Amino acid sequence: MFFKQLAVLSFATSALAAHGVRNPGTNSLNFNRIDKRFTFPIPESQGSQTFEATYTISGNETFDGGMKTYGRGVDCSGQAEGGDSDAVFIVKDGGTLKNAIIGADQIEGVHCEGSCTIENVWWEAVCEDALSLKTGDGPFTVIGGGAQNADDKVIQHNGGGTVSISGFTAYNFGKLYRSCGNCDEMYERHVTLESVTAVSGSASLVGINSNYGDTATIKSDTCVTDVDTVCTEYEGTDNNDEEPQEISTGPSNACQYTDPLPSC
């Protein structure tokens, strides 16, 4: 009888593991973890174009990239800070970039100088940052698209105002969104995440500076798998020579979400 019960238990455990179900009392999946089989859903490229200089999208202009891959023909320089001249695109106040793939052959990705819309834009591989919201008080809108293989940040918010991120996919990243923690000029910033898919995040989905009044609102239709922390609060500083200090993690008045978020 004992051996029959043991055999049944062994079969049940194997069945759960085969379907990637968590073992009771553990925090890991048996055998088939989602991040091991996750496929980053980047669209098929419709061609490629290499810019010799940064391409500027003027205010109120919409640049439709036709799902081509755009780059600068250079090697990534890691986390060394680049400048506007290293970006693939600069989007001026009121401009829109849509339907584009940012190739791995670049340093700075996309810069927004003022309010911008980034729609269905994908990053093959993030270098320093994927998207830098450099100036202005927004609103900044990210619709769809995605980024993968970011050692640190995907979206860096240096200006003020509000960022809306919806339907975005982040895979193998450090932080999806970071409100600048030590810019020379600090602002109150707000971010909302809706229908975001985040898999394999080594640091935090969102990082904000609550001492400057920042807030993060993460809707319950956002899913996370193997993301170290959902929301981290920092004490930001306007001294660029200092690093911001972590205050807390988890839901709060500044980090607004229901814990736990669903798995992807």
From Swiss-Prot:
Cofactor detail note: Binds 1 Ca(2+) ion per subunit.
Protein name, entry field: Probable pectate lyase D
Cofactor: Ca(2+)
Enzyme Commission code: 4.2.2.2
Reactions performed catalytically: Eliminative cleavage of (1->4)-alpha-D-galacturonan to give oligosaccharides with 4-deoxy-alpha-D-galact-4-enuronosyl groups at their non-reducing ends
A GO CC annotation given for this chain: extracellular region
Ranges of compositional bias, category Acidic residues: 235-245
Glycosylation (residues): 60
Family: Belongs to the polysaccharide lyase 3 family.
